[in-house]
Amino acid sequence: MKFLFDLFPIILFFVAFKIWGIFTATAVAIVATLVQIAWVAFRHRKVDPMLWVSLGVVTVFGGATLVLHNDTFIKWKPTVLYWAFSVALIVSQLAFNKNLIEAMMGKQITLPHAIWGKLNVVWGVFFVLLGLVNLFVAYNYTTDQWVNFKLFGATGCLVVFIVGQSLWLSKYMKEE
């Protein structure tokens, strides 16, 4: 259910794009992200920092798209967000010796310390690559194809990556 809730702004963006076009869809994405944060704050009293980052990025890049009437900015938004995730993962590990993946998932699964480190780096690299793929699609395909990729392609890549990670991690997980 959380996965679908996380996709809420993307799904609304997709639907709005198909009905009204990129500029209305961009405005819808900004509002949907605000609503998502308001709901999380109301329900849990705490909003994940990455949701705030997402709101900032969609507001800045979406706002630039609307003000300048240029869809290039909204096409850069996923890449900037993916790269922000990557930087957060890698810098937190290298500069602060804090593994964010372990901090998020450490209570759910038990893994050797070295595997947590590898997992953190692999996720960081994945987000860099996903950002590059987004730019490739944004600059080499139509806006309609990019929107389809944003919902189905990027989400599909994420699901496949998570399944692959689960299979890889299963051999390291301790029996409880």
From Swiss-Prot:
Give the record's GO CC terms. plasma membrane
Domain of life, per lineage: Bacteria
User: Is this entry keyworded Membrane?
Assistant: yes
The subcellular localization recorded is: Cell inner membrane
The way it spans or sits in the membrane comes to:
Multi-pass membrane protein
What are the UniProt keywords, alphabetically?
Cell inner membrane, Cell membrane, Membrane, Transmembrane, Transmembrane helix
Record bears the keyword Membrane: yes
Transmembrane spans: 24-44, 49-69, 76-96, 119-139, 149-169
Task: Please explain the role this protein plays, according to its UniProt record.
Answer: Plays a role in cell envelope biogenesis, maintenance of cell envelope integrity and membrane homeostasis.
| Family indicated by similarity | Belongs to the YciB family.
Q: Which HAMAP family match?
A: YciB
Instruction: State the protein's name.
Output: Inner membrane-spanning protein YciB
| The species this protein was found in | Paraburkholderia xenovorans (strain LB400)
Species lineage: Bacteria, Pseudomonadati, Pseudomonadota, Betaproteobacteria, Burkholderiales
Q: Which gene encodes it?
A: yciB
